[in-house]
Each structure stands twice: as C-alpha cells, then as structure tokens.
Swiss-Prot record:
Top-level lineage group: Eukaryota
Post-translational modification, as annotated: A soluble form is produced by proteolytic processing of the extracellular domain.
Family: Belongs to the SCF family.
Signal peptide: 1-25
Protein name listed in UniProt: Kit ligand
PANTHER family for this protein: KIT LIGAND
Lineage of the species this protein comes from: Eukaryota, Metazoa, Chordata, Craniata, Vertebrata
C-alpha cells in the first residue's frame, strides 16, 4: 500500500513539473522594451531627411481605446520595420550601414517580442473587422519613429491589463479623416550625423505579401508553440495516470490472497488447538 501511495505522489509531482512550462508560457512575458529604443535618435540622424517609410496606420480616435489601437498598429510596424531592414541588408558598401542595420534589427526584435506579448488570438476578429480604419502613408524617419515611440508608450501603459481587456468598438465610430492628431508636425532635435545614401522606400506587391506572411507566421508560431506545450503536458499527464493504474492493478490484488492465507492460518491454529484440547480430555478420562 505504501509503495502504491509513493508511486501516485511521484506521478503527481512529475505532472506538475511537466505542466510548469505551460504555466510559464501563459504568464506575463515581462518587459520586451529594452534600452535599444534609445538608439532611435541616432538612426533618425543617419537617415536622409527626405527618406520616406511606408506605414499602414490607424489614427487615434476618442472612440478607439488605446489598447485596441495598439493591437491594430503593432503588426503594421513589424511589417514596415522588416521592409526597412531588408533594404539595409541589400547595401554593403558603406561603413554606417552596419550600425543602422543593427539598430533597426533591435527595434524589429522589440516590436516582434511586443507582438508576442499581445493576445492576438483573443482579438484577431477585432483586427479583421476594423481593417477599414487603416490608412497608408509615407512618413519621414522623424515622424515614423515618433509614431513608433507612441506605440511603445501605449504598451507600457497597458502592459499589465492587455490580456484582460477585450477590444470592442462602439456602434458609432469616428471617421479617421482629417483627424488633427494624425498630422505629425511637432519637430524634435536629433544629433547631426552624416546621412546615408539610401534609395526611397518602394514596397512592391511581392514584398508586401511576403512581409504579411512573415508577420502572420510569427503570430501563428507563438500560438502553435503554446498549443504544442499544452498537448505535450496533457499527453504526459495521461501516460502518467495510465502507468499508475497499471501499477495499482498489479500490486493491489496481491494483498487479497495474503489476507486469505492469514485467515486460513488462523483457522488452522484454532483447529489444532481444539484437537489438542480434545485429545487431552480423552487422555484425562482414560486415566
């Protein structure tokens, strides 16, 4: 009996260890925003002032909660940064390209990690239903990365409650046209750095479709990773219970024959004692 209890406890502990990665995967992902965002000023200084970066964006509206705006903007920033990264990877004859490439690569990693932290599976219908809110424009580096920083700030504000808030648009939605907050006219000063000669951003249909597939693949890969962990843990749990049941069936029936044997032994002893007493009585009568 003690061996069976020990086996059950051992199986239970093993299941807790196997389910631990699943718990970690579902827990908070921490802070994906690193100090690499501080290099944005350097990157903007390196890019030509007239360089244009294409971005599909959603203007901020009073009827659109900030955390929902974040779900709409993050995938588009991932695509635009990926396209920008690809353009720098095609240039290899300038000394400052490696520095720019490294900065853009770090920013791409940040936005991808941020995208992994968002509950896209929970709000994917919201993103599909509000695709009409997007507008496409070409931004100079200063304005593009100002919008990027705005997205980062919104994430920091709602990081602890993103998985608890559902994105539901009210029945009446403002039209994003002529929104005063869309136009980015405020200027900020960046350190003067020699501008790299870089051709303007021209995203073709093939590049756009490839980047869309990669961004969607990134989202699906994170979801598939969680599903695979869950299935592995559940399968291990099932195997553990099956092994425990088999062990129980093998060990438990053995206790019954032993108990029967002990009962029979006790019966034999009683019969022997009775026969001995009867024999002594006979001997006593004969005397």
């Amino acid at each position: 009996m003690k061996k069976a209890q020990t086996w059950i406890i051992t199986c239970f502990c093993l299941q807790l260890l196997l389910l631990n990665p699943l718990v970690k995967a579902q827990s908070s992902c921490g802070n994906p925003v690193t100090d690499d965002v501080n290099d944005i000023a350097k990157l903007v200084g390196n890019l030509p002032n007239d360089y244009l970066i294409t971005l599909k964006y959603v203007p901020k509206m009073d009827s659109l909660p900030n955390h929902c705006w974040l779900h709409l903007m993050v995938p588009e920033f991932s695509r635009s940064l990926h396209n920008l990264l690809q353009k720098f990877s095609d240039i290899s004859d300038m000394s400052d390209v490696l520095s720019n490439y490294s900065i853009i690569n770090n920013l791409t990693r940040i936005i991808n990690d941020l995208m992994a932290c968002l509950a896209f599976d929970k709000n994917k219908d919201f993103i599909k239903e509000n695709g009409h809110l997007y507008e496409e424009d070409r931004f100079i580096p200063e304005n593009f990365f100002r919008l990027f920083n705005s997205t980062i700030e919104v994430y920091k504000e709602f990081a602890d409650s993103l998985d608890k808030n559902d994105c539901i648009m009210p029945s009446t939605v403002e039209t994003p046209e002529n929104d005063s907050r869309v136009a980015v006219t405020k200027t900020i000063s960046f350190p003067p750095v020699a501008a790299s000669s870089l051709r303007n951003d021209s995203i073709g249909s093939n590049t756009s479709s490839n980047s869309n597939k990669e961004a969607l693949g990134f989202i699906s890969s994170s979801s598939l990773q969680g599903i695979s962990i869950a299935l592995t843990s559940l399968l291990s749990l099932l195997i553990g219970f099956i092994l425990g049941a088999i062990y129980w069936k093998k060990t438990h029936p053995k206790s019954r024959p032993e108990s029967n044997e002990t009962i029979q032994c006790h019966g034999c002893q009683e019969e022997n004692e009775i026969s001995m007493l009867q024999q002594k009585e006979k001997e006593h009568l004969q005397v």
